[in-house]
C-alpha cells in the first residue's frame, strides 16, 4: 500500500515545488495517521503544509487507496529528521547523527557521531573520542540528525 500511496502523492508534492521526503502510516492511541513529510531548501512553513495537504486530500478522496479511516498529516521532517533512504544518508554525510540499534553493539544500543561514510554493509561515524566506528546497517533501527550542525 505504501508504494501505491507514494505513486499517488509524490507527483502532487513535486508539482507544487516541494521535495517528497517520506511517507508512513502509523497507529497512535487507536487512530491511524497517514504522515507525509515534505521539504524544500529554505524550510517548510505551515502554509506549505496546508497547501500540500489540500492537494493530497482531494486526490486521496478521489482515488481512495486506503481501506480504513485515517487522519492526514503533512509536515516537515524537522531538524532531527529521520534518515530513511540511501539518498538521505548520503545527503547528510558530514553531519552529526544519532543512531539507535536493534541490539547491543559494544555494550550500547545508542551512538552519536559525525556521519562520514555510507555503504551497502555499514554506516561509519566518528565518535567523541575521534575514532571511526563502523555500524552494520542490519543492526540499525533508526538514524536521525542530531541537530548539531
Curated annotation (Swiss-Prot):
Pfam families per UniProt: DUF150_C (PF17384), RimP_N (PF02576)
Top-level lineage group: Bacteria
GO biological process: ribosomal small subunit assembly; translation
Keyword terms: Cytoplasm, Ribosome biogenesis
InterPro entries: Ribosome_maturation_RimP, RimP_C, RimP_C_sf, RimP_N, RimP_N_sf
Keyword Cytoplasm appears in the UniProt entry: yes
Places the protein is found: Cytoplasm
One cellular component term from this protein's GO annotations in UniProt: cytosol
Family: Belongs to the RimP family.
PANTHER family assigned to the protein according to its UniProt record, in alphabetical order: RIBOSOME MATURATION FACTOR RIMP (PTHR33867:SF1)
Identification of the protein by name: Ribosome maturation factor RimP
Species assigned in the record: Clostridium acetobutylicum (strain ATCC 824 / DSM 792 / JCM 1419 / IAM 19013 / LMG 5710 / NBRC 13948 / NRRL B-527 / VKM B-1787 / 2291 / W)
Amino acid at each position: 500500500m505504501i508504494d501505491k500511496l507514494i505513486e499517488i502523492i509524490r507527483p502532487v508534492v513535486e508539482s507544487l515545488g516541494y521535495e517528497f521526503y517520506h511517507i508512513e502510516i502509523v497507529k497512535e492511541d487507536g487512530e491511524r495517521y497517514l504522515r507525509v513529510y515534505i521539504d524544500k531548501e529554505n524550510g517548510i512553513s505551515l502554509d506549505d503544509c496546508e497547501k500540500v495537504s489540500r492537494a493530497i486530500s482531494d486526490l486521496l478522496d478521489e482515488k481512495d487507496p486506503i481501506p480504513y479511516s485515517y487522519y492526514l498529516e503533512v509536515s516537515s521532517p524537522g531538524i532531527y529528521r529521520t534518515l530513511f533512504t540511501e539518498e538521505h544518508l548520503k545527503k547528510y554525510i558530514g553531519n552529526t547523527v544519532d543512531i539507535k540499534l536493534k541490539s547491543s553493539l559494544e555494550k550500547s544500543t545508542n551512538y552519536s557521531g559525525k556521519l562520514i561514510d555510507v555503504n551497502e554493509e555499514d554506516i561509519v561515524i566518528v565518535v567523541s573520542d575521534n575514532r571511526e566506528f563502523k555500524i552494520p546497517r542490519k543492526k540499525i533501527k533508526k538514524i536521525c540528525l542530531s541537530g548539531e550542525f
